[in-house]
Regions:
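Surface-exposed, glycine/proline- and aromatic-rich loop segments on solvent-exposed faces
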Residues: 96-121
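Acidic, serine/threonine-rich low-complexity disordered tracts
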Residues: 24-101, 127-229
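Bacterial N-terminal signal peptides
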Residues: 9-17
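General helical structural elements
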Residues: 6, 121, 138-142
Length: 229
């Protein structure tokens, strides 16, 4: 049964064009981080049709700063089909990221959009392989993610959540190829008590040439807003 479920997951990721990023090379048990980030049922409790809004911000010393938005539109799938129909608008204009819609989504596809954009940005600033960065993130989520319970404040209440943190380039044997951009930490906050299950995604890239606590080179933050429609 587990192997069949994993096969379904791999097929879904392949349909999204991100198989090499987040699917294992061979069947193995999913880590707690993978389960909470990719496999949790994050959409079934939503209304029949709803739009979730996320605020995106980029700050830091390396490049121009900006703010933008992402939206997740969710509707019921056809009768007898498990999951939900989803459409994501991730950022706008020349910054927009396009991936195929999901017709049987169970997990929140905004996670995939965030990671795919991040990987493309790593390629842009380092000229390194997108597939390589995908693999680093995937392996770290499999084997070296830290998952801890936390409390967040959402919609006027304190609610239980989990924070997943990864440092995918810390022990990379090829780190010397992109040393300046390798100090990059990621955190993902997920909760059953917020619409869509994903509250926040955050990455911080620090400059190895500056003292700890200096302003980051890149700080990117995506946060669920409270104005679902």
């Amino acid at each position: 049964m587990k192997h069949a479920f994993q096969s379904c997951l791999l097929a879904g990721l392949m349909a999204l064009g991100v198989l090499s990023a987040f699917a294992a090379d061979e069947v193995k048990p999913f880590s707690e981080a993978e389960k909470r980030l990719f496999l949790a049922d994050q959409l079934s409790a939503l209304p029949k049709t709803v739009t979730l809004n996320y605020k995106f911000s980029k700050t830091g010393t390396l490049e121009a700063n900006f703010e933008d938005m992402a939206t997740l539109k969710v509707a019921d799938a056809k009768s007898g089909v498990k999951g939900r129909v989803t459409h994501v608008n991730f950022l706008t204009g020349e910054r927009k990221i396009a991936l195929p819609d999901a017709g049987e989504a169970v997990g929140n596809p905004v996670v995939m959009f965030y990671l795919e954009r991040d990987i493309r940005e790593m390629h842009r600033i380092t000229n390194g392989s997108e597939n390589y960065y995908r693999k680093r993130i995937r392996l770290t989520l499999e084997d070296n993610a830290v998952v801890k319970p936390i409390t967040i404040h959402y919609a006027g209440a304190d609610v239980a959540a989990f924070e997943i943190t990864i440092d995918p380039y810390k022990d990379d044997p090829a780190r010397s190829r992109y040393t300046r951009f390798a100090n990059k930490l990621y955190s993902f906050i997920v909760s059953d008590h917020v619409p869509g299950g994903v509250y926040q995604m955050h990455s911080i890239m620090s400059d190895p040439q500056l003292p700890a606590g200096s302003e980051p080179m890149i700080d990117e933050l995506l946060t669920l807003q409270e104005n679902a429609q």
